[in-house]
Amino acid sequence: MTRVFRVAFAGLVFVFALSGCVGPAPTTHTYESKAVRTANDSLSELQTVLLSVQMTRRGRMMQVYLETVLSESEDAFSSIQNTFDSIQPPDTGRADQLRAGLDTLLSDGADGLAQLRILARRQDTRELAAEAHKLTATAAALDKFAQEHG
């Protein structure tokens, strides 16, 4: 029984270790595909947040729910960003350009989401609207990135 338990435990550890790993992208095309998926996934989070801010400003969503949406979207966005950053790009200049371009957009998005969360908790609706407007530009840039490389 002890041996069976050890084998099962070792198998579970192996499965969990593999599930946290993201392998290298063997070609620039593969890397570009992963970058496009990342751009689309992160864009989705930004669109959710922007819609939530808009609905809250119009009185159609409670402030407490906005704060929840912002917090969860920020966590999801961070996970998307970390997953992309863990991918080993191929050794090409084009892959380096893709990474640099998308990383800038992801950083802008993460910063904007954090700022929105802070402003929402302070219930600063004027600044919240201004920050959401800035985040709209980041969302548009992510969409453009996905369209150009998709």
Annotate each language-model stretch with its function.
Residues 1-11:
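Bacterial N-terminal signal peptides that target proteins for export
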Residues 10-15, 124:
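Core hydrophobic alpha-helical membrane-spanning segments
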Residues 16-20:
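C-terminal motif of bacterial Sec signal peptides marking the signal peptidase cleavage site
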Residues 21-26:
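Bacterial signal peptide processing site
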Residues 34-41, 45-110, 127, 134-148:
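Alpha-helical segments in soluble extracytoplasmic regions
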Residues 116-127:
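Short helix-adjacent coil turns
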